[in-house]
Design a protein with these regions (language model features):
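Cytosolic-facing loops and C-terminal tails of multi-pass membrane proteins
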Residues: 131-215, 222-242
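Phenylalanine-focused residue identity feature
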Residues: 47, 61, 73, 86, ...
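A short structural micro-motif
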Residues: 69-70, 178-182, 277
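Substrate-recognition/cap regions that form aromatic- and gly/pro-loop-enriched pockets
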Residues: 204-285
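Membrane-embedded catalytic scaffold of the fatty acid hydroxylase/desaturase
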Residues: 1-147
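Residue-identity detector for threonine
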Residues: 32, 37, 77, 124, ...
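Short, structured coil/loop segments at alpha-helix boundaries
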Residues: 12, 83-86, 96, 103-104, ...
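Weak global preference for isoleucine
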Residues: 67, 114-116, 202, 243, ...
Length: 286
């Protein structure tokens, strides 16, 4: 089930819109594994219905899903080379580097989460070539530190093309066809340049030393806040969680905006303070 969910996440535009968040990073390290979609569960559950119909107990499903998720953390690294026989049977760092690459030779390969046998069985396996360095990211470059835009980018593009398509069938196909497919009339009115590896430049807007230190401290504070939020989320009321989630989101958005030079550090602190004050007032804190 996971193999087909993952594969369709690359072959169906609406599923790719959710999964793209995980692939947007132009670096490939353990932090990439933590870059997870916020909307994948909206349609992803459909692929696990056969397991429910087959009578798989929820506890077994949950444990296996957790093992699958935790296993995939360590394969997001460039520090581990090829592992010989292990690469032939399992999802490994080498195999998963191929999966994250945008090179023509590597595109849409190696979907297996733990076993790579599924890719060998269904014809989607590709070995990492020592002469073809993996280039990471997405072909529709994000070029932003905005967490909201990161989650909405692909959806926005699909909505635009669907809205402007003249034929109703094309309005639907925009969402179901493979990523990159566009109705002829939309492509003519809103042309996009063809993909080129030359455009895969690392997004690295200039930052002063002060901004770099500001970002480091802010990230540490936000990371602590996220940890505290997750620690109590299961027992806290929904309204409580929603309010603190909004505070953290404002903080993350403001930090990204500072790093891109869209707002200054003082403005970011003012926005974060306003969000925090509003939250504490709404929750009745004094």
């Amino acid at each position: 089930c996971y193999y087909w969910l993952h594969r369709m996440g690359h072959e169906s535009a609406v599923l790719w819109a959710a999964h793209a968040v995980h692939h947007q990073s132009q670096d490939y390290n353990l932090s990439t594994a933590l870059r997870q979609t916020s909307s994948g569960a909206l349609l992803g559950w459909v692929f696990y219905v056969p397991m429910a119909l087959a009578g798989v107990p929820p506890l077994v499903f949950g444990v296996v899903a957790l093992i699958d998720l935790l296993y995939q953390f360590w394969v997001h690294t460039e520090q581990v080379g090829k592992l010989g026989w292990f690469d032939r049977w399992f999802c490994s760092p080498s195999n998963h580097r191929v999966h994250h690459a945008v090179n023509d030779a590597y595109l849409d390969k190696n979907y297996g989460g733990i076993l790579i046998l599924w890719d060998r069985l269904f014809g989607t396996f590709k070995d990492e070539d020592d002469h073809e360095k993996c280039v990471y990211g997405t072909r529709g470059l994000l070029n932003s530190w905005d967490p909201l835009w990161a989650n909405a980018q692909v959806y926005a593009g699909l909505a635009h093309d669907s809205w402007h398509a003249r034929h109703w069938a094309d309005k639907l196909k925009v969402w179901t066809k493979p990523p990159g497919w566009r109705p002829a009339d939309v492509a003519e009115r809103f042309p996009k340049p063809a993909f080129s590896m030359a455009q895969m430049q690392i997004f690295q807007p200039p930052m002063s030393r002060a901004v770099q230190w500001f970002a480091l401290v802010q990230f540490a504070v936000l990371l602590t806040g996220v940890g505290a939020f997750l620690w109590q989320a299961d027992t806290a009321p929904l309204a409580h969680n929603a309010i603190w989630f909004a505070v953290l989101l404002v903080g993350q958005w403001a930090l990204g905006a500072v790093m891109q030079g869209r707002i200054g550090m003082l403005m970011a602190l003012m926005l974060q303070s306003a969000a925090l004050a509003t939250a504490t007032s709404a929750l009745g804190f004094t």
